[in-house]
């Protein structure tokens, strides 16, 4: 009987050890940029994920979910069919609409419908009881919500033609995403994100090219709110 117990314990330990890498090969990444389209291309939307450490590319079966201002799901989550190739630390993953692919000349790693509602909403990587990461904005009202804290630009939302980007300065640096010991994620969207010119990037390392007919410029600032607007000649 003692031998059986030892054997059972060894099997259990082996299963735990083999499961450990699988539990850590996709979730150490964060949402770093969100774009909700512009006046001429309202469906040109995208979300950029970024890996904090190497080896976070096993995305098959994992998903991105979208929510309206009341916290209700919009459509069904978009699901990765498999892993992405580049697993280096700081690698990006692009989830985008076909309109965004065309506008920025970039191939998405996962195609999404235009589910982002600029006035208010939330999106999560791995939505569920314990999402990996979320961002909320505007008049999102399903509060309190520990996954987003205070929405980004509450009452204003995502400015047309502007992207919002995670502030990487919380850990003391400005160019490297940290989400382990030093952390660029405070779980408060108002604190974590700032407006920026759209600059999507995909897992292949390509960056979006802004259409020459689009001019992005800083348009307004009011208190903590600000944004970029778009002029299409």
Regions found by a protein language model. Give the residues of each.
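Residues within well-ordered beta-strands of beta-sheet-rich folds
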Residues: 30, 46-50, 65-67, 94-96, ...
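A structural motif detector for short, solvent-exposed N-terminal "entry" segments of globular domains
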Residues: 21-71, 212
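Conserved beta-structured recognition patch
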Residues: 60-61, 109-203
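Surface-exposed loop/edge segments in extracytoplasmic proteins
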Residues: 71-78, 129-134
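Intrinsically disordered, low-complexity Pro/Gly/Ser/Thr-rich segments with frequent PxxP/GP/PP motifs
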Residues: 77-103
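Extracellular carbohydrate-recognition regions
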Residues: 213-226
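Bacterial N-terminal signal peptides
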Residues: 9-18
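Bacterial N-terminal signal peptides that target proteins for export
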Residues: 1-10
